[in-house]
């Protein structure tokens, strides 16, 4: 079943290829959506697709790429959003 989740990731997550790595991982899991930097230093990630794959992606986001240091991740299910690819904003 296709669903959408939004996640906010805190820690050392900007300037460490977090968004680009998230895009690569999302593509591996056949997910669409986006990853974008927020003014407060966090990263926001929208994930759209199969719920099982989103759960796997959320586990990956809890650690992120090697250079990142995730201190907190918050996520919630949101109304379905149609995205055809995963973009970086």
UniProtKB/Swiss-Prot annotation:
Residues 4-89 form the Acylphosphatase-like domain. The active site is at 19, 37. The keyword Ion transport does not apply. It is an enzyme of class 3 (hydrolase). It catalyses: an acyl phosphate + H2O = a carboxylate + phosphate + H(+). Its EC number is 3.6.1.7. It comes from the Bacteria. Gene3D superfamilies: 3.30.70.100. Keywords: Hydrolase. PANTHER family: ACYLPHOSPHATASE (PTHR47268:SF4). This is Acylphosphatase. The gene is acyP.
